[in-house]
Amino acid sequence: MRVLPLALAAAIFSGVTAILVYLSGLSSYGGARVSDADLAALGALQSGFSKCVDANGLGLKAIPGEDYCRVVIQYPSDTDSKWKDPKTGEPEGLSFEFNLCEAVASWEQVRNSTTILTKEYIDALPNGWEEYAWRRINKGIHLNKCQNRTLCMEKLSLVLPETPPYVPRQFGRCAVVGNSGDLLKTKFGDEIDSYDVVIRENGAPIQNYTEYVGTKSTFRLLNRGSAKALDKVVELDETKKEALIVKTTIHDIMNQMIREIPITNPVYLMLGTSFGSSAKGTGLKALEFALSMCDSVDMYGFTVDPGYKEWTRYFSESRKGHTPLHGRAYYQMMECLGLVKIHSPMRGDPGRVVKWAPTKDTIEAARVASEKLLKRPGAGSEGPLSSCTMIKKREKGKTPKRSVVRHAALKHLEYMRGATRYPLERNAGGGYLCMINER
């Protein structure tokens, strides 16, 4: 008769223990405890974010989700969704869920990392040449995982610096210029030329459009097709000083053009972070590149105003776009996280103030809390190297020679103790490789 009460007591004890473990797990991840202050920081970010989207989104509304991280950006119900999924034939939806914790943690890491592929990065990776290097070479699968390292190095050598040519905060004000046909509605040319750095995309021309897109061009992000036409791309900038950043792989035809024409512009391969199902295309990679080296980033020529009907380019015929409503919502999220400032025909005032934009303190507190919730490496720890998944020492004599003179960049290098942080592109769990100087 006493067996049942004992069994019941054991079950109750087990259940209570499970509940306590569960509740404990809600506030502690990998030793990094999520405090009440952390939750308050996320709540403040979410609340301010919703107000920012409502105030600046030209009809978009932000609806808080089921927790402090999630938010839904909603289009007006009368929005005419023109784009259809080529696989299903279904029109694009009018609401999109975003995870603010993921976005804050990922983008703030981008701001403190390099986005240029280097030789020291490949050398430092475990089996970097056998497992990674060949993937950055067109048809690299035929290179037998770079067992002949000399051959692989020969194919990469023209685009592979030893150490990063750019560092975080190296530049002040940067403009990323997209290719949208909306650029022809507003004469942004002089305004764009006033930036310290201008980043353009693919084969977008400058001549004949200068009053709309400006004349300055510091960098150009290239997709696969544009990279294979490198000889034509270099003609777009009369100064021939534009640095060309290829986001895919190096081709033999590219190497041939660099050597034989010759092309004297700097050419590099991009090393980037994965943002999952976020806005796609060269535009997002251009923003990522800009955020990795600029204090502030402004964007022009992205289709971000209401009334989208088709993907247009300012220099050619209309083309089929890709998830335009999702893209507009994602870029609005970026603006309301303080990452970029949007310029468009309906937002043409250069002095426009982004209402309810978060402060640096708000973002920093939310980043710390987000990293704890997401179990990011080093979450809750202090110090510049706490987020590093791997730390490797540079060989003697290979410390990067810095010509950086901006105070903000020098302060960043001082904070990082001279270390360089790289995103681990092919690491399923994300993470960062940090290269430190030999002391």
From Swiss-Prot:
Q: State the EC number(s).
A: 2.4.-.-
Q: What class of enzyme is it?
A: transferase
The protein's location, in the record's own words, is: Golgi apparatus membrane
Can you tell me where the transmembrane regions are? Answer: 3-23
Q: Which Pfam families match?
A: Glyco_transf_29
The way this protein sits in the membrane is described as:
Single-pass type II membrane protein
**GO CC field:** Golgi membrane
InterPro entries registered for this protein in UniProt: Glyco_trans_29, GT29-like_sf
Specify the superkingdom: Eukaryota
Give the glycosylated residues.
Answer: 112, 148, 208
Enumerate the GO terms in the molecular function aspect.
sialyltransferase activity
Q: Name one GO biological process term.
A: protein glycosylation
* Sequence ranges on the Cytoplasmic membrane side: 1-2
Tell me which UniProt keywords the record has, alphabetically: Glycoprotein, Glycosyltransferase, Golgi apparatus, Membrane, Signal-anchor, Transferase, Transmembrane, Transmembrane helix
Membrane topology, Lumenal segments: 24-439
Q: What is its main location?
A: Golgi
* Role description: May possess sialyltransferase-like activity in vitro.
Q: Which protein family is named in the record? A: Belongs to the glycosyltransferase 29 family.
- Name the record gives this protein: Sialyltransferase-like protein 4
**Gene field:** STLP4
